[in-house]
């Protein structure tokens, strides 16, 4: 074993600990439920991306098992070899109907989808215009593409237009999260569509955190705003509101065929197991049949936001069921997290580099499995915190 190498790693770990940025895995049970178990403590689960409460639904599990009953556990190969089992075609057909596009393609994960899409459609001599707060998978896709990576200030359409005006690039790709995972606010999709049409760009929207919850059928923010025909690429995941695992992209048929021949993160990996793809089908059915789930999570999200705002907490401009409580300094953040977990809330600290330095936060998420009583109790626990991360309110 190379002792110098290990010593260098240990020094880096020590620096992480000194900054309060060291991370560890913590065994967690019942993570799909409203209350979970972590380090032998029962905690209110405000840390899950299971927004619609589907992952723990008995109906979801039963439908999935029925659809997958005649298949083996493993897919045995990549999709382009023999791993493209019939459930893939069924699920992708349902995706095209749901997203109102010509075609769709399922990837192994949302991360793999973003990396594969972006690195396939742009390259040297092209440019990607990316919101500063886009997910790491988008950033990594931009870097792998070798295109010029031009980041615009968060939701700043004037800055984006300035960059587009100055761009000499032939191929221009604009990519944004529809709902930003660490701030809980929305992209300005109407303005983005206008700019992409004005400057001849391609627009890619990542619906990872909005898919399933927004729109008449849960199709996402693009559907809710009626922009299906004007957004070129709709990407999303099955791992959040849809309660399963995997990523997807929907768009024009030639584009999907192009990805099938160029996206390395699809071509050079084993296909998802049939059971997982069966769960995609089951989730798509439930999302469209049960609108009460998305209605409930929106109402509960508003209830939590209102309660915390009244206590003086900064919520990063959240307008959704993702409710980040801004604390700031890492050490203060860890103290708040420990206090909340001692009170009975799974309050997971989010630190740099996931968020900008000095903007550490407790990222709270609401699901349709929660009750009003759960939310009100959580607000009470925040009220008991010392004045860290919130302003003092005048009477």
Swiss-Prot record:
Coiled coil: none annotated. The modification N6-(pyridoxal phosphate)lysine is found at residue 240. Gene3D superfamilies: Aspartate Aminotransferase, domain 1, Type I PLP-dependent aspartate aminotransferase-like (Major domain). Its cofactor is pyridoxal 5'-phosphate. Its EC number is 2.3.1.47. Pyridoxal 5'-phosphate binds at residues 110-111, 181, 206-209, 237-240. One of its GO terms (biological process) is biotin biosynthetic process. It catalyses: 6-carboxyhexanoyl-[ACP] + L-alanine + H(+) = (8S)-8-amino-7-oxononanoate + holo-[ACP] + CO2. InterPro entries: Aminotrans_II_pyridoxalP_BS (IPR001917), Aminotransferase_I/II_large (IPR004839), AON_synthase_class-II (IPR050087), AONS_Archaea/Proteobacteria (IPR004723), PyrdxlP-dep_Trfase (IPR015424), PyrdxlP-dep_Trfase_major (IPR015421), PyrdxlP-dep_Trfase_small (IPR015422). The keyword Transcription regulation does not apply. Keywords: Biotin biosynthesis, Pyridoxal phosphate, Transferase. Pathway: Cofactor biosynthesis; biotin biosynthesis. Belongs to the class-II pyridoxal-phosphate-dependent aminotransferase family. BioF subfamily. Homodimer. This is Putative 8-amino-7-oxononanoate synthase. It comes from Halalkalibacterium halodurans (strain ATCC BAA-125 / DSM 18197 / FERM 7344 / JCM 9153 / C-125) (Bacillus halodurans).
């Amino acid at each position: 074993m190379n002792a110098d190498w290990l010593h260098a790693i240990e020094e880096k770990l020590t620096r992480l600990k000194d900054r309060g940025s060291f991370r560890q895995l913590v065994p967690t049970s019942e993570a799909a439920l409203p209350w979970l178990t972590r380090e032998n403590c029962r905690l209110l689960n405000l840390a899950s991306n299971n927004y619609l409460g589907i992952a723990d639904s008995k109906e979801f599990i039963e439908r999935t098992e029925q659809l997958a009953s005649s298949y083996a556990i493993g897919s045995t190969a990549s999709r382009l070899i023999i791993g493209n089992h019939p459930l893939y075609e069924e699920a992708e057909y349902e995706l095209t109907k749901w997203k109102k596009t010509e075609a769709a393609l399922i990837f192994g994960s949302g991360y793999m989808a973003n990396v594969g899409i972006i690195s396939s459609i742009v390259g040297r001599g092209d440019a990607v215009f990316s919101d500063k707060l886009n997910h790491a998978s988008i950033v990594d896709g931009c870097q792998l593409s070798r295109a010029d990576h031009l980041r615009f200030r968060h939701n700043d359409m004037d800055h984006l237009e300035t960059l587009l005006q100055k761009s000499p690039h032939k191929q221009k790709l604009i990519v944004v999260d529809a709902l930003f995972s660490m701030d809980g606010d929305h992209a300005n999709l109407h303005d983005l569509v206008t700019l992409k049409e004005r400057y001849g760009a391609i627009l890619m929207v990542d619906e990872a955190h909005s898919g399933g919850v927004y729109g008449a059928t849960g199709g996402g923010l693009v559907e809710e705003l009626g922009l299906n025909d004007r957004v070129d690429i709709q990407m999303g995941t099955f791992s959040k509101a849809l309660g399963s695992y995997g990523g997807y992209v929907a768009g024009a048929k030639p584009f999907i065929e192009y990805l099938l021949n160029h996206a390395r993160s699809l071509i050079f990996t084993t296909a998802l197991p049939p059971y997982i793809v069966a769960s995609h089908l089951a989730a798509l059915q439930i999302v469209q049949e049960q609108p009460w789930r998305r209605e409930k999570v929106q109402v509960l999200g508003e209830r939590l936001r209102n309660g915390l705002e009244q206590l003086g907490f900064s919520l990063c401009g959240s307008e959704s069921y993702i409710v980040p409580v801004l604390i700031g300094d890492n050490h203060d953040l860890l103290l708040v997290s420990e206090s909340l977990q001692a009170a009975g809330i799974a309050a997971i600290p989010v630190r740099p580099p996931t968020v900008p330095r000095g903007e550490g936060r407790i990222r709270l998420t609401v699901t349709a499995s929660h009750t009003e009583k759960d939310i009100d109790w959580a607000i009470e626990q925040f009220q008991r915190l010392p004045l860290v991360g919130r302003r003092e309110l005048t009477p």
